[in-house]
Every structure is written in structure tokens, then in C-alpha cells.
From Swiss-Prot:
SMART domains linked to this entry: AAA (SM00382)
Binding residues annotated for Mg(2+), in chain numbering: T95
Annotated family: Belongs to the RuvB family.
Organism: Synechococcus sp. (strain WH7803)
InterPro entries noted in UniProt: AAA+_ATPase, AAA_lid_4, DNA_helicase_Holl-junc_RuvB, P-loop_NTPase, RuvB-like_N, RuvB_C, WH-like_DNA-bd_sf, WH_DNA-bd_sf
Protein name, entry field: Holliday junction branch migration complex subunit RuvB
PANTHER family: HOLLIDAY JUNCTION BRANCH MIGRATION COMPLEX SUBUNIT RUVB, PTHR42848
């Protein structure tokens, strides 16, 4: 139960109120299509790369199957979709999936993030303006404050807001009924969610890194939407270097487009041009960037390959430990170039080989 001011409790927030408006984005199917037709609108190109329907969403087959069944069942019963928690590394399509679900359900998707919901009236303002069956997407949901979480408990379970109006002896409890809605939460740290919040999600699904075949299809689709003529080898090269992440694939594709534009490349973009563009941005053949190599080289040069503690490495690199752990390390771990041990981080034999660093026995010799 949360304490809010009597003014906030007695008035239903209006979407057009300036100071009290909660920072969020409303995505509507018809408006989305209009934005895509007008490339002059902010975000038109960015949104145009996002798939709109489950059939267009490439990869994550098991996730699509589970959510597809849930959507069909909810539509068939005329109910709101059960609450969904999506977790996994950044850039794998959690926000896109929320927008796809809203499109499949034919409802409005309200997009916000946990850091934007600092005050109780922020989350209250969002919840009381939801229409029946609307989808509310909260990114970085693990960063919700305790008060915001407590407001969500009855809202998710009983479609009710429990508010305490006033203070001291004049305090009274007021319950506001909410329409049926779907909360879709996204997080890169599922373990950081409190158990009461996590247990209120009916569907908890993990997004996995993408395979090469799916990434090739994603790059081909994005190239078509950006009016780029990519050779098959060029497409494969981008897919190999994007760290199994569609967001990075689209970013690298745009950097290739920049180089092609400057080079006045009027024909098909080939593998050589892709290699030139990505080498310029210090992305090597396995997708490692400058941050990855700095971490591994620090371990090798200053710590003999490890082990070394995360805080020690972060201080030496001038990085935040959380950034190293959540952004840099996952892909190195996936490739088998890095190991996490109780004593710290260690560069593996595969990591040494990739950097051309001699093995310990060679150094001793």
C-alpha cells in the first residue's frame, strides 16, 4: 500500500496535463503505420525496422510459439493477455516483442521504463488511464522502487489500486478499480526482481542469443527496408560480427551504409566493403569490439591471464563494474573466451588464441 497526496488520489490524472504527465510512449497500430509512411517523422526509420506481427518476428521460435498460443487463447476468450516477463541480454527484442503482442491483440501499447516511475503518482497516473485490455510495457523493471512494486501487486493480481489518502489520524484507505490490462516487464537481470513481483507474472520467458541463420535473415530484411543491395557474403559477414544480437546487427548495417554512401557505392555492397566499414569501427571477425579486447588484454598483460576481480578490472579500465558484467562479459562468456571463477575472471585458451597471445607453456619456453 502506498501513500499519495489527497489531490493525486481524488483526481484521475489526465493524459494532457503537462507537469503530471508520466514520461511514456503510446504505440498505436494505425499511428505506427502512418509514421512509417512519412520518413520525415522522428523515429520513422527506426520503427520501420521493427517487425509488426509474430509472423514477421525472426528467431526465438519457442518464445513465439508460447506467446502465440497465449495470444490466441486470450483473444478467443475475449480477455486481456496474462502478464508477461521477458528477460535476457540487451538488444534481443524485448521491446519489439511487447509492441508485436499489442499489435496481435489489437490494443494500445504504453511504453515506459522503471527509472521514469520515481513517484507513486507516476505509476498511479499510468494505471488509471489504461483502457480495457491495454498493454503496459515497463523496461528495466528490476529498477522499480519498493513503493511502485507495492502499488503493482494488487493492480496485477486483483485489478485494484490501494491508496492511502492523507496522513496521521486523517488517513484513510481508498481502492480504485482498474480495467483488465496486461503488464509486460523487460529486464536484463531477472534475479534482481523481488519474488512477490516475479510470481505475479503468468508468463516468464527468456530471450536467447540469435543463431547465424536467423541473423542473416534479420540483416537481409533490414537491408531491404533501408533500400540497400547486399551480397549474400556481405550479409553473412555482418551476421557473424553482431554478437548474436539484432540491435547490433542493425547498427552495423547502418555503419556499412554510411561507408557505402561516402564511397559513392552505386552497386551491390560486397564483403570487402563490409570488412572495411567494420574494421574502421574496430569490430573484428568474431564481433569483438575495443572494449572486449581492452578487458582481455588487461587480464593478459597485467594479471597473466587471470584470475582478477571484477572491481579491480573495472577500476583499471575506468568502467563501471555493472557495465563490464552486463555489457562486455556476456558475449565473451558465450564465445568461451572468458571464464568467471570464484577467484575472478580468467582468459581461456580460446581467448588467448583469438588475440594471438602465447600460451603459458610457450612463454615459459
Amino acid at each position: 500500500m502506498a501513500i499519495v497526496s489527497s489531490n493525486a488520489a481524488s483526481q484521475r490524472p489526465r493524459p494532457d496535463r503537462g507537469p503530471d504527465r508520466v514520461p511514456n510512449r503510446v504505440v498505436d497500430g494505425a499511428r505506427q503505420a502512418e509514421d512509417d509512411r512519412d520518413p520525415g517523422r522522428v523515429g520513422a526509420k527506426e520503427d520501420s525496422l521493427r517487425p509488426k506481427r509474430l509472423a514477421d518476428y525472426i528467431g526465438q521460435r519457442e518464445l513465439k510459439q508460447v506467446l502465440g498460443i497465449a495470444v490466441q487463447a486470450a483473444v478467443g476468450r475475449g480477455e486481456a493477455l496474462d502478464h508477461v516477463l521477458l528477460y535476457g541480454p540487451p538488444g534481443l527484442g524485448k521491446t519489439t516483442m511487447a509492441m508485436v503482442l499489442a499489435e496481435e491483440l489489437g490494443v494500445t501499447c504504453r511504453i515506459t521504463s522503471a527509472p521514469a516511475l520515481e513517484r507513486p503518482r507516476d505509476i498511479v497516473g499510468l494505471l488509471v488511464t489504461l483502457q480495457p485490455k491495454d498493454l503496459l510495457f515497463i523496461d528495466e523493471i528490476h529498477r522499480l522502487s519498493r513503493v511502485a512494486e507495492e502499488l503493482l501487486y494488487p493492480a496485477m493480481e486483483d485489478r485494484r489500486l490501494d491508496l492511502t489518502v492523507g496522513k496521521g489520524s486523517t488517513a484513510r484507505t481508498r481502492a480504485l478499480d482498474l480495467p483488465p490490462f496486461t503488464l509486460v516487464g523487460a529486464t536484463t537481470r531477472a534475479g534482481a526482481l523481488s519474488s512477490p513481483l516475479r510470481d505475479r507474472f503468468g508468463l516468464i520467458q527468456r530471450l536467447e542469443f540469435y543463431g547465424l541463420e536467423d541473423l542473416q535473415a534479420i540483416v537481409e530484411r533490414a537491408a531491404g527496408l533501408l533500400d540497400l543491395d547486399l551480397s549474400a557474403a556481405a550479409c553473412t559477414e555482418i551476421a557473424r560480427r553482431c554478437r548474436g544480437t539484432p540491435r547490433i546487427a542493425n547498427r552495423l548495417l547502418r555503419r556499412v551504409r554510411d561507408v557505402a554512401c561516402v564511397r559513392a557505392c552505386a552497386g551491390r555492397i560486397d564483403q570487402a566493403l563490409v570488412d572495411e566499414a567494420l574494421t574502421l569501427h574496430r569490430v573484428d571477425g568474431r564481433g569483438l569490439d575495443a572494449s572486449d579486447r581492452r578487458l582481455m588484454e588487461l587480464l593478459l598483460q597485467s594479471h597473466g591471464g587471470g584470475p582478477a576481480g571484477l572491481d579491480t578490472l573495472a577500476a583499471a579500465l575506468g568502467e563501471d563494474p555493472a557495465t563490464l558484467e552486463s555489457v562486455v562479459e556476456p558475449y565473451l562468456l558465450q564465445l568461451g573466451f572468458l571464464q568467471r571463477t570464484p577467484r575472478g575472471r580468467v582468459v581461456t585458451a580460446a581467448g588467448r588464441g583469438h588475440l594471438g597471445w602465447p600460451y603459458p607453456q610457450e612463454q615459459a619456453a
